[in-house]
Amino acid sequence: MRVIGVIGYKDSGKTTLIEEILKHSDKKIAVIKHTKEDVEVDKKGTDTYRLSNAGAKITVLATDSKTVFFTDRMDLENILSVLSDYNIDFVIIEGFKEALKRLNIPKIVMLKDKDGSDLIDDHTAMIIEDYNYNIDDVLKVIYEKAVVPTMNLNCGHCGYNCRTFVKAVVKGEARWDDCVLAKGIKIIVDGKIIPAVPFVSKIVGSTIKAMIETLKGVDNPKTIKVEIDVSKLK
């Protein structure tokens, strides 16, 4: 799963651009939209509202066509962590200007009458002025510049820290898949991502894959997730 942001001030065309991306891309894309408005998405008096007020940490409403999760506010890191469990190619983040900067996520900056120029920095992968863009150029930027979210791991295996790595990707001096987290193996210990060099990642991945494939009901797996409760290995 790779991420890229779309930022700009009000009426700069952010949502319209994302709509066009979704219409023209053949990739599986999730969208995160930030709003400063205090929107009440659940209605007072409904069953889900009552259950949430009664103390449910998460309330899930399932209909025949949609599923909605009601929970407390989540920061961008936690939202991305949840989305990583889905079979998604890209996540487009609308807004979250400060979080994008903090998490070193590249972005497309939308300008309207030059308004928004202050948002441009060394993580800006593309600048779009006054709605003028070619959608193929936008898709090319997304496919080449979106990165795997590192959460500021700063492991150094790529030869950079996370901030300078994204800067290098934006400038074309590095590829997004130079990051060790893009190699298909993610090791998480007690909630902390543990970086592994490609050689170690390949050994771990190949070993687990070979073991899993011997189990009944496993046929040509595409993704494998193993969670171990160490306290129960006694």
UniProtKB/Swiss-Prot annotation:
Residues 134-196 form the 4Fe-4S domain. GO terms for biological process: Mo-molybdopterin cofactor biosynthetic process. Pfam families: FeS, MobB. GTP binds at D11, S12, G13, K14, T15, D42, K43, K44, G45, Y86, N87, I88, D89. Its cofactor is [4Fe-4S] cluster. GO terms for molecular function: 4 iron, 4 sulfur cluster binding; GTP binding; metal ion binding. Keywords: 4Fe-4S, GTP-binding, Iron, Iron-sulfur, Metal-binding, Molybdenum cofactor biosynthesis, Nucleotide-binding. Binds 1 [4Fe-4S] cluster. Transmembrane segments: none annotated. [4Fe-4S] cluster binds at C155, C158, C162, C179. InterPro entries: 4Fe-4S_dom, MGD_biosynthesis_adapter, MobB_dom, P-loop_NTPase. PANTHER family: MOLYBDOPTERIN-GUANINE DINUCLEOTIDE BIOSYNTHESIS ADAPTER PROTEIN, MOLYBDOPTERIN-GUANINE DINUCLEOTIDE BIOSYNTHESIS ADAPTER PROTEIN-RELATED. Belongs to the MobB family. GTP-binding protein that is not required for the biosynthesis of Mo-molybdopterin guanine dinucleotide (Mo-MGD) cofactor, and not necessary for the formation of active molybdoenzymes using this form of molybdenum cofactor. May act as an adapter protein to achieve the efficient biosynthesis and utilization of MGD. Displays a weak intrinsic GTPase activity. This is Putative molybdopterin-guanine dinucleotide biosynthesis adapter protein. It comes from Methanocaldococcus jannaschii (strain ATCC 43067 / DSM 2661 / JAL-1 / JCM 10045 / NBRC 100440) (Methanococcus jannaschii).
